[in-house]
Amino acid sequence: FNYTKLGTIIALAGANFFKSINIGLIPLMIIFILFSAFMNLFMGSASAKWNILAPVFVPMFMLLGYSPELCQLAYRIGDSCTNIITPMMTYFAVIITFAQRYDKKAGIGTITATMIPYSVAFLVCWTILFAIWILAGLPIGVNTGLFYPMG
């Protein structure tokens, strides 16, 4: 991204697009949470995903007036909820091995099918809690707000 400046170009284009459609904070964060959850199904490493997504989404959200911490919080919600259903997870083989102690036929499909309802429930509950947090205007951390002061 440094050589081509593609991250900056995508961030500017994305910020302009979201400004033009006048999307609110909560719908934007829900879209980002779902995108993060979807990306997690294909890439297991949270830090590698963040290294790919952060150069685009952090500046994009900052241009929209939202703090980088808010962006990372939304990313972590989406990322954490689908960890158990992605075969790309580092410990997926270990989980299958433990499950096979109790059911010799357990495999990838068994674990994924068993965990999808939990994953969806976590995703829905965390997203609702996140929306309530935003509506309440609570800070994310010490000296950290939801919004990024422009100029």
Regions found by a protein language model. Give the residues of each.
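Membrane-interface alpha-helices at helix entry/exit sites of multi-pass transporters
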Residues: 26, 65-74, 103-114
